[in-house]
Regions:
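Short, well-ordered alpha-helical scaffold segments within catalytic/effector domains
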Residues: 60-61, 132, 162-165
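Active-site/ligand-binding-proximal alpha/beta "capping" segment
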Residues: 137-167
Length: 167
């Protein structure tokens, strides 16, 4: 568990933040963890809300926007996902090289907040190449098998249909 590596300074349960969305998914602790990793200040979300829980997209992206406004410069995401690539196996780790957004609605819909970014962001370089190289190098040094692939973002909570698998 990545959060276990953090030297914790403060934990704030989402339920203690007025108006903040709280996950209904079992296993999602639902709290921010503020602290340090190797003397680097970090904020970690232990659990999150999902669009399929019935939250509006503005609530789903609220935590990410909040972290940006708090000064976060790098967003490192992890999740469990189904896969359609037959060369992948359950439990494989995958570095996302690009994505296909089959997600509706787009999380950028709504009022644009200039402090968070431009109205129409360039999506050609969403995934930082230097950070990806560092992740690949570290995985190799640690003897961690790391797949690379394209992430297809769907709303859930259903598994992929046969047509989606063939895409």
């Amino acid at each position: 568990d990545y959060a276990e590596e953090i030297q914790v300074v403060k934990e704030i349960p989402y339920g203690e933040i007025e108006g903040f969305p709280v996950s209904t998914v079992p296993g999602h602790a639902g709290k921010f963890i503020f602290g340090y990793l190797d003397e680097i200040p970090v904020v970690c979300m232990k659990g999150r809300v999902h669009y399929y829980e019935g939250y509006p997209i503005t609530d789903v992206v609220l935590p990410t926007r909040l972290m940006k406004l708090l000064g976060a410069q790098i967003l490192f995401l992890t999740n469990a996902a189904g896969g359609v690539n037959t060369s992948f196996h359950a439990g494989d780790l995958m570095l996302i090289k690009d994505h296909i957004s089959v997600f509706a609605p787009n999380p950028l819909i709504g009022q644009n907040i200039e402090e968070l970014g431009v109205r129409f962001p360039d999506m050609s370089s969403v995934y930082d190449e230097e950070l990806q190289e560092l992740i690949k190098k570290t995985a190799k040094e640690q003897h961690i098998f790391l797949q690379e692939g394209i992430y297809a973002q769907l709303t859930g909570p259903s598994f992929e249909s046969p047509a989606e698998i063939r895409m």
